[in-house]
Amino acid sequence: MYEYFKGIISKITAKYIVLEVNSIGYILHVANPYAYSGHLHQEAKVYVHQVVREDAELLYGFATEEEKQLFLSLISVSGIGPVSALAIIAADDNAGLVQAIEQKNITYLTKFPKIGKKTAQQMVLDLEGKVVAADGLAESKAPVQTVDNQELEEAMEAMLALGYKATELKKIKKFFEGTTDTAENYIKSALKMLVK
């Protein structure tokens, strides 16, 4: 088992990053790959969890130890696998997730991909009182400004019209939240991120 890898982020895709450690490139599946864009071709420390299956060995990466612990808590719940756990972490500020578990808010929990009522109830049963918000994540995902960014919205709508997937665009949009730019520049930057 591995605790973390320290290496150079050499590639970023919509689903994973590649971390080069001692001339070996490791594919790390992460919640929001574009959050690592500022560290492309730079050294980074990424916490990891290894999943060994009959047909594959997969590595999941996390920005903080708290994010990794939240992931491990989620996959301990019957009905939640690694892919679903990453989707939950990517879609929420984590503080909201923990609050929903503590308040037994089944409706809130069922908004996550592939989480039905039964799995949401199991989450509450298994995790109530056992999880804490990943503080670093909640802080880093909070938008710097709360006003609507019309230019960013326009850019995302244009890219959706061009055929890009909404799931990819959602991750990119999160990366740009709190910034100010023109729709044209947002599109150019987003295209660069998508082709890397």
Swiss-Prot record:
Residues 147-196 are annotated as: Domain III. Residues 64-142 are annotated as: Domain II. Keywords: Cytoplasm, DNA damage, DNA recombination, DNA repair, DNA-binding. Coiled coil: none annotated. The keyword Lipid metabolism does not apply. GO terms for molecular function: ATP binding; four-way junction DNA binding; four-way junction helicase activity. One of its GO terms (cellular component) is Holliday junction helicase complex. It holds the Pfam family RuvA_C. InterPro entries: DNA_helicase_Holl-junc_RuvA_I, Hlx-hairpin-Hlx_DNA-bd_motif, NA-bd_OB-fold, RuvA, RuvA_2-like, RuvA_C, RuvA_C_sf. It is found in: Cytoplasm. Residues 1-63 are annotated as: Domain I. Residues 143-146 are annotated as: Flexible linker. SUPFAM superfamilies: DNA helicase RuvA subunit, C-terminal domain, Nucleic acid-binding proteins, RuvA domain 2-like. GO terms for biological process: DNA recombination; DNA repair. Belongs to the RuvA family. Has three domains with a flexible linker between the domains II and III and assumes an 'L' shape. Domain III is highly mobile and contacts RuvB. The RuvA-RuvB-RuvC complex processes Holliday junction (HJ) DNA during genetic recombination and DNA repair, while the RuvA-RuvB complex plays an important role in the rescue of blocked DNA replication forks via replication fork reversal (RFR). RuvA specifically binds to HJ cruciform DNA, conferring on it an open structure. The RuvB hexamer acts as an ATP-dependent pump, pulling dsDNA into and through the RuvAB complex. HJ branch migration allows RuvC to scan DNA until it finds its consensus sequence, where it cleaves and resolves the cruciform DNA. Homotetramer. Forms an RuvA(8)-RuvB(12)-Holliday junction (HJ) complex. HJ DNA is sandwiched between 2 RuvA tetramers; dsDNA enters through RuvA and exits via RuvB. An RuvB hexamer assembles on each DNA strand where it exits the tetramer. Each RuvB hexamer is contacted by two RuvA subunits (via domain III) on 2 adjacent RuvB subunits; this complex drives branch migration. In the full resolvosome a probable DNA-RuvA(4)-RuvB(12)-RuvC(2) complex forms which resolves the HJ. This is Holliday junction branch migration complex subunit RuvA.
